[in-house]
């Protein structure tokens, strides 16, 4: 039986090596997400609303997105029109078309950002009919979406990397450090 501290040291080293071996994925997949990120940034900077949702397994990530894009201490950042669509009363339950019509009347130029599986038909109708959208999906339901592997052992890590890329790109463009 191994000593606990030796086990931790070995685990950390193994994880570090594994992540290092997989770290090139962002470079390899750049063509699939760069246009989507640029389009989303342009949408937000032109006054559009970004309605964010996630499947039940990635609710933690939804909270992470919302708390990082609009932190409670807004001294350093402007307030962005980023809304928790999962918590919205407009989240489709029965009539997706009615929900979409209400959303479009309520939010200025809404765009949907969904992460994960699409867990109900009403949401699927809305997400797949609204163009443009910023979809990070596990199954290819739409041409312009970022396709991820649900059972990827590094999925959470990749989601965080993608978000950090998006967040840094958004604020770099917003503060005129980068042009679209």
Swiss-Prot record:
Cofactor(s) needed by this chain: Ca(2+)
Note: Estimated to be present at about 3000 molecules per cell A structural homolog of E.coli DiaA.
Record-linked InterPro entries: HobA, HobA_sf
Organism whose genome encodes this protein: Helicobacter pylori (strain ATCC 700392 / 26695) (Campylobacter pylori)
Purpose of the protein: Required for DNA replication initiation. Increases binding of DnaA to oriC region.
Keyword Signal set for record: no
Classification of source organism: Bacteria, Pseudomonadati, Campylobacterota, Epsilonproteobacteria, Campylobacterales
Coiled-coil segments: none
Cofactor binding mode and count: Binds 4 Ca(2+) ions, it is not known if they are physiologically relevant.
Disruption phenotype: Essential, it cannot be deleted (shown in clinical strain N6). Depletion studies suggest it is required for the initiation of H.pylori chromosome replication (strain N6).
Binding, Ca(2+) 4: 176
Binding site for Ca(2+) 1: 17, 27
Key words, A-Z: Calcium, Metal-binding
Pfam families: HobA
Descriptive protein name: DNA replication regulator protein HobA
Annotated gene: hobA
Residues involved in Ca(2+) 3 binding: 140, 143
One of the record's GO molecular function terms: identical protein binding
Entry keyword Metal-binding: yes
Induction comment from the UniProt entry of this chain: Expressed in logarithmic, stationary and cooccoid stages (at protein level).
Subunit text: Forms dimers and homotetramers. Interacts with domains I and II (residues 1-112) of DnaA. In a crystal with domains I and II of DnaA HobA forms tetramers with DnaA fragments bound at the dimer interface of the tetramer.
Record: residues binding Ca(2+) 2: 140, 143
């Amino acid at each position: 039986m191994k000593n606990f501290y030796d086990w931790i040291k070995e685990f950390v080293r193994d994880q570090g090596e594994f992540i290092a071996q997989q770290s090139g994925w962002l470079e390899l997949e750049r063509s699939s997400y760069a246009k989507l990120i640029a389009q989303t940034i342009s949408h937000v900077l032109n006054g559009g609303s970004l309605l964010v949702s996630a499947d039940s397994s990635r609710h933690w990530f939804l909270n992470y997105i919302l708390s990082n894009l609009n932190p409670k201490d807004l001294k350093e950042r402007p307030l962005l029109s980023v809304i928790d669509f999962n918590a919205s009363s407009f989240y489709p339950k029965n009539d997706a078309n009615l929900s979409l019509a209400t959303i479009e009347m309520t939010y200025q130029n809404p765009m949907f950002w969904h992460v994960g599986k699409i867990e109900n038909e009403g949401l699927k109708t809305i997400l797949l009919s609204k163009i443009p959208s910023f979809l990070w999906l596990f199954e290819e339901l739409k041409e312009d979406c970022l396709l991820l592997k649900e059972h990827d052992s590094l999925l959470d890590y990749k989601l965080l990397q993608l978000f950090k890329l998006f967040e840094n790109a958004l604020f770099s463009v917003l503060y005129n450090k980068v042009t679209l």
